[in-house]
């Protein structure tokens, strides 16, 4: 679906401009990876990463079911597209379909408390 700016009504142009600005500012895109734990001092950083993270890794190595306790695995989903059937836009490719995938991620987070992992294939 190609957008011909000349064919847009003033209301459609205003919506297009608002939508593009919405996706661009203040931070690009609609999803982000944010910590669920405080990272306000050296102790927090030592628990979140090295050396503290090793204990979570070793516990999961001994009992893989603990991954649901010590990681986001239990509430993390992937949203992936090959871009061949994106909403009513048709075959626009995976990169152009990324805003739709981010939008789905926002809905999952808002209404299902599930967090999305961006597609590694941009």
What are the residue ranges of the model-derived segments?
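Terminal helix/beta-alpha structural elements that buttress the NAD(P)+-binding lobe
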Residues: 11-38
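Extended, charged alpha/beta regions that create polyanion-binding interfaces
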Residues: 23-26, 35, 100, 104-114
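An N-cap/entry alpha-helix motif that binds or orients negatively charged groups
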Residues: 28-69
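Gly-rich Lys/Arg/Thr-decorated short loops/hinges at beta-loop-alpha junctions or inter-strand turns
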Residues: 41, 81-90, 108-114
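Structural signal for hydrophobic packing residues in well-ordered secondary-structure cores
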Residues: 49, 53, 64, 84, ...
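Short coil/turn connectors at secondary-structure junctions
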Residues: 73-76, 112-114
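Glycine- and acidic-residue-enriched helix-capping/strand-helix junction motifs
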Residues: 87-102
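Conserved small/polar residues in nucleotide/adenosyl-binding loops
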Residues: 115-122
């Amino acid at each position: 679906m190609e957008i011909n700016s000349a064919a847009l009504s003033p209301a459609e142009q205003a919506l297009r401009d608002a939508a593009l600005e919405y996706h661009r500012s203040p931070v690009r895109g609609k999803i982000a990876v944010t910590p669920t734990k405080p990272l306000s001092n050296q102790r927090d950083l030592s628990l979140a990463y090295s050396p503290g993270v090793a204990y979570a890794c070793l516990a999961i190595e001994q009992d893989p079911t603990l991954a649901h306790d010590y990681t986001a695995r239990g509430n993390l989903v992937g949203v992936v597209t090959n871009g061949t059937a994106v909403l009513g836009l048709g075959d626009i490719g995976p990169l152009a379909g990324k805003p739709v995938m981010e939008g789905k991620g926002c809905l999952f987070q808002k209404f299902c408390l599930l967090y999305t992992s961006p597609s590694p294939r941009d």
